[in-house]
């Protein structure tokens, strides 16, 4: 009886330790960028295939996870994989691709790309199941709601860029966000100490660039519609499971 009691106590503390480990991993979900890559490596098709394989591996683990905590642990891992793939693998191929209002090329540096198509195409190529044509053709606020998967987007009016940067640094987690402006869209990359704007720049037809948001002439706007990408658990799950992102359209 005494041995049974000891074994029961050991099993109890082991179980608590396992749960504590998962809880710690759940809360330690910050996305970190040791460096921002601006140079593509290898071929675009090979880069997509490599990370789609990693996505499938994570999806299998997610489907086989038996508890909510275990699933959340995989979601947290997927956040970092997605952020790394989008910012440091997929997007670098697009730097230098020229802007055009009607541009919709699907091949980096060949042809031209409008701001909405830059976002929708890179989201599709990073593994989201989304209609890149339909998403790119919507108003900035509807694009944001489509990506957020709800009406619960952050709308900021009449804020100076420097104040928006300070808001992000103080209140937002590191990661990638969609941002819609008055007549423009792109990505925001929030790191520990900086806010970057990644977009197909219409000014002087510059095309796809990454800029410090505070220094970007194209980032000035009366309104900002912000949707979370890499810290959006529901969106990450859809990415893993290849579920369709429903595009919100103007009625």
Model-based region annotation:
Residues 195-196, 200-205, 209-251:
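Low-complexity, Gly/Ser/Thr/Pro-rich intrinsically disordered linker/tail segments
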Residues 2-7:
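Sec-dependent signal peptide recognition
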Residues 17-19:
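Bacterial signal peptide processing site
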Residues 26-136:
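N-terminal capping segments
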Residues 12-15:
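C-terminal motif of bacterial Sec signal peptides marking the signal peptidase cleavage site
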Residues 138-210:
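...with weaker cross-activation on analogous glycine-rich loops/strands in unrelated enzymes
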């Amino acid at each position: 009886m005494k041995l049974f009691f000891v074994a029961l106590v050991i099993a109890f503390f082991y179980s608590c330790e396992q749960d504590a480990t998962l809880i710690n991993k759940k809360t330690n979900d910050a996305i970190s960028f040791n460096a921002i890559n601006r140079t593509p490596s290898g071929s675009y098709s090979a880069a997509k295939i490599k990370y789609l394989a990693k996505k499938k591996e994570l999806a299998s683990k997610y489907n086989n996870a038996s508890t909510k905590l275990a699933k959340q642990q995989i979601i947290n891992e997927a956040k970092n994989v997605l952020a790394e793939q989008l910012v440091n693998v997929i997007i670098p191929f697009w730097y230098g691709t020229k802007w055009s209002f009607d541009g919709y090329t699907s091949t980096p540096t060949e042809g031209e790309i409008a701001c909405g198509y830059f976002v929708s195409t890179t989201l599709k190529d990073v593994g989201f199941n989304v209609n890149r044509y339909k998403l790119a053709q919507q108003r900035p606020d509807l694009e944001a709601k489509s990506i957020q998967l709800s009406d619960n987007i952050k709308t900021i009016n009449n804020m100076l860029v420097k104040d928006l940067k300070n808001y992000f640094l103080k209140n937002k987690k590191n990661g990638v966000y969609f941002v819609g402006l008055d007549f423009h869209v792109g990505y925001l990359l929030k790191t520990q100490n900086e806010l970057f704007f990644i977009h197909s720049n219409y000014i002087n037809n510059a095309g796809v660039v990454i800029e410090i948001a505070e220094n970007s002439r194209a980032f000035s706007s009366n309104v900002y519609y912000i949707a979370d990408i890499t810290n959006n658990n529901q969106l990450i799950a859809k990415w893993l499971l290849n579920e369709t992102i429903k595009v919100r359209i103007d009625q």
